[in-house]
Design a protein with these regions (language model features):
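N-terminal export signals
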Residues: 5-25
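Signal peptide processing junction and immediate N-terminal pro/mature segment
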Residues: 24-35
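Residue-level hotspots at or immediately adjacent to binding/recognition sites across diverse folds
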Residues: 10, 34, 38-394
Length: 394
């Protein structure tokens, strides 16, 4: 699913402010506003049915930005390898064959950069491409990729190769048509396929913003009614193929939105982190979890407050189900949140090896199973020796 990588968010924050998490530890570093020490008596919940699943290593630093599943026997994870801080490396892809994750050869992709996002077509979508991915080229171009059964191949789209045209995230509607958030002609837009095979494409009008800027739309989703939802910066909006409907702007001093889950126009969930005002180098962010009720955004209590929430995933009915998080005070395992119908409750992933800090930035439900894939990296910062990490529930 599409979701902005926590590590990528850290990189953007570091580039803009000189802050990052490289100096953060698990004990006495300065917390973000609203954080503080872990409350006494807040015991670590058991790991439930989570387990780590081996994934082929790449050249560090390795980041998995997104994961998507077509079913129990086929899934895709995408990202990059050979990254160093804010300098992108090379595209990296992995494929689940029903028994193990395999390395996917993408050496034919003749660009340096990152595979940003991946989305799978739903079962039964006539004529649909099995999966789509979007990529970032360090030279400044956007790339659309289609799965051909063995690897990822470049796919044509209007604006391909144009300076200033960028593709951020991808989603597939129930009928197999595709929605991509991107930038073209100086505006933030949605690129839509008119057919499931991706032979005809059209761009939306630009997203209207209060300040006239064009935010990077890191997140895109299609709701049950077929409307496209996007988020970027402090902007969240819905495009119904006729017009934009912009929600109230998000409050936050140094806010990064990592993911978005719209279930209805009056039921929208949002995850991320916010560094707040001031603080020394190495200050960790505070968790952001918000809900929109059709009128206003409200903060929702999370089981931990210092760290980041990296992704949110629905259940088979499209209802909120699971959030992946990184807990600053206890980073020895991923800190998941599960929706019980009234509140988000703690659920821990498998314990990591010494020196490994799981930062899970992507989630995907596994159709037909009730399970989930979770993908990310093994360190707080995008430097060697960070490697890919994949966990599975169910």
């Amino acid at each position: 699913m599409r979701r902005r990588s926590f590590v990528r968010g850290l990189t953007a924050t570091t580039a803009a402010t000189g802050l990052g998490l490289t100096a953060a530890g698990h004990g006495h570093a300065t917390a973000a506003a609203g954080g503080g020490n872990r409350p006494a008596g807040n015991a670590r919940p058991r790991a439930a049915a989570w387990r780590e699943v081996p994934v082929p290593a790449g050249e560090p630093a390795v980041l998995l930005n997104a994961v998507a599943a077509a079913g129990p026997d086929l899934a895709w994870a995408v990202g990059e390898e050979a990254r160093s801080g804010s300098t992108s490396g090379r595209p990296l892809a992995r494929t689940w064959d029903g028994s193990a994750w395999q390395a996917t050869d993408v050496s034919h992709l003749a660009f340096a950069g990152s595979l940003r996002n991946v989305a799978a077509a739903p079962a039964g979508a006539a004529g649909a491409v099995a999966a789509w991915a979007v990529a970032y080229d360090r030279a400044g171009a956007g790339h659309l990729l289609a799965w051909d059964g063995a690897t990822w191949r470049e796919h044509d789209f209007p604006g391909r190769g144009e300076s200033g045209t960028e593709l951020w995230a991808v989603a597939v509607a129930p009928d197999g048509t595709v929605r991509i958030s991107g930038t073209r002609d100086g505006g933030s837009r949605v690129l839509r396929s008119d057919d499931a095979g991706g032979t005809r494409w059209s761009w939306s009008p630009p997203l209207p913003t209060d300040d006239g800027t064009a935010p990077s739309l890191w997140n895109v989703h299609v709701d049950g009614a077929g409307a496209t939802w996007v988020s970027g910066g402090v902007d969240v909006a819905r495009y119904d193929d006729r017009a934009w409907h912009v929600l109230p702007r998000l409050a936050g001093l140094r806010l990064s939105v990592t993911d978005l889950l719209p279930t209805a126009p009056d039921d929208i969930w949002l995850t991320g982190h916010d560094y707040g005002a001031g603080g020394p180098p190495g200050k960790p962010p505070g968790v952001v979890l918000r809900h929109f009720d059709g009128t206003a955004w409200s903060d929702v209590a999370a089981p931990f407050t210092v760290g980041s929430l990296g992704a949110i995933a629905p259940d088979a009915a499209g209802r909120p189900a699971l959030i992946a998080g990184w807990d600053f005070w206890d980073g020895a395992s991923a800190h998941y949140l599960r929706w019980d119908g009234t509140a988000w409750t703690s659920e821990r992933g498998p314990a990591a090896a010494q020196g490994v800090t799981p930062v899970m930035s992507a989630l995907a439900p596994i159709p037909g199973t009730g399970g989930f894939w979770s993908a990310g990296t093994t360190a707080q910062s995008p430097f060697p020796p960070a490697q890919a990490r994949i966990e599975r529930y169910g």
